[in-house]
Amino acid sequence: MKKNYISALAVLACVAVFCTISGNSFHQMRTATEEIIPGEGVTEVRMLSDYFPDLAGTAGDTQIYVLQGEQEGGSCLILGGTHANELGGHMGAVLFVENAKVEAGTLYVIPRTNNSAFTHNDPQEGHPSTVHITTDEGNVREFIHGSRATNPVDQWPDPDVYVNYMGQSLSGSEN
């Protein structure tokens, strides 16, 4: 009987170690951010919660980079990172933040529009969690490669099946 307790404790200890290691990995992804270096054209950095206070402190809150021209003019909004696994939109917005200069009007840039999607990825699809880019100066920059969808932790409970207005049954994560 004593052998069973020892075996059970050994298995329990192994499970606890595994859970701690994997939990730490998930926590690091959930709190990770990449470095975005605002260029000289950025006149202000705001948060989306400045416009909708209920977002403050949630994964939906994200930075808005404002580039104000010296002359009056129109306004333009650039949304990057709508799908965090599509690097083109995110990287395009980052390039604007780091390099653009506005002469007239105002440019608003949100590199991480779906901020929650950057807090997880699709591991069963073989996606990396980060992408590394070497700059001309030889520095390596790291960017997060997230998921197309919002993190399930931020939208739970999500229905298993959703029936749309036409009566079609869809996976709860696809609506």
Regions found by a protein language model. Name each.
Residues 2-175:
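Structured catalytic-domain cores with a bias toward divalent-metal coordination
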